[in-house]
Amino acid sequence: MTSIKQRDELQSTIWKIANEVRGAVDGWDFKQFVLGTLFYRFISENFTNFIEGGDESVNYANMPDDVITPEIKDDATRTKGYFIYPAQLFVNIAKNANNNPNLNTDLAAIFDAIESSANGYPSEHDIKGLFADFDTTSNRLGNTVEEKNRRLAAVIKGVESLDFGNFEDNEIDLFGDAYEFLISNYAANAGKSGGEFFTPQNVSKLIARLAMSGLASVNKIYDPACGSGSLLLQAKKQFDAHLIEDGFFGQEINHTTYNLARMNMFLHNINYDKFDIALGNTLLNPQYGDEKPFDAIVSNPPYSVNWVGSDDPTLINDDRFAPAGVLAPKSKADFAFVLHALSYLSARGRAAIVCFPGIFYRGGAEQKIRKYLVDGNFVETVIALPPNLFYGTGISVNILV
């Protein structure tokens, strides 16, 4: 079977399983269990592959936990960013999932142990809270412990049945592609709320290519409203990973989506030391401003959202907004994101940002910001996209480069 055919069959199967295991629960409300279980399987196989190191005589899943020395644990955690004992591996939990009366508490303990394994290590920020949305006590799983365990077992056995082939032979990001396929389907079925965290693949491909056009390499790439990380990862898919020297950076305001983005990085085999996703409000509490500027910025920020704007008199003196001499309107933060991105660009950098069309013709403060951008020769082009490309909205949008 070709890799492409394998991927297509895998995606068809995984969506069927995702719908079967959720029962009467809305897919949007159940997504964290399917996505989280897929992630759990991936990091288990990724970690096993690292420990075994291609030695066919080593079977990590069959080892007793007590053979793991502190030195082994320390070395593995420094390299991978986390540690998983053999008994905690997905494959070993899946074996007895249907007959484990303590499945929900076992999973909670394992997820807590995986997160805690990074405490005190450089990866702590990247691992902490990854499983926070995988609530094994949630009533969405059922009203009783038995019902919860049956639903959890169904999810685990469903994910176990997926054929990803040998982990070390996986050349086309099958895990990552499956994860993004699920996210896109959940977004499409959720309607408007889906667009908050996922940019359709055809649009994200264009944005990634625009931001990196003509550049043989970039120091790093950044998304100030990164959602689930799909835009950042398109840059990885469109260009060899070595062209992005220092990795992938993003900030996300929604806690659940922030966790999805971090999982997405791992699932696309980006090691913890090659990405940094921050949680918080980009406009009011920006991260990375003290670091080296970015050669490439991609973003699909929320359209015309409210922000504090002129209600905070200190913002007009913010290095990001002061050069324009005016703040974006309180009811339309679009240009605040644009000015933020501009201030984070290196001298040779380029940003490609999806924008609501209104910012290109409305008067007032937005007109003044447009004049600043044009007079400063900061605008390379504006590309008009057709309608109905984005989940939950039929409006046409533009890409500002």
Tell me the role of every PLM-derived stretch.
Residues 13, 20, 29-42, 327-401:
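Conserved Class I SAM-dependent methyltransferase catalytic core
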Residues 34, 175, 218, 245, ...:
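A structure-centric signal for secondary-structure junctions around beta-strands
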Residues 104, 325-327:
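Extracellular loop and loop/strand-boundary signature of outer-membrane beta-barrel proteins
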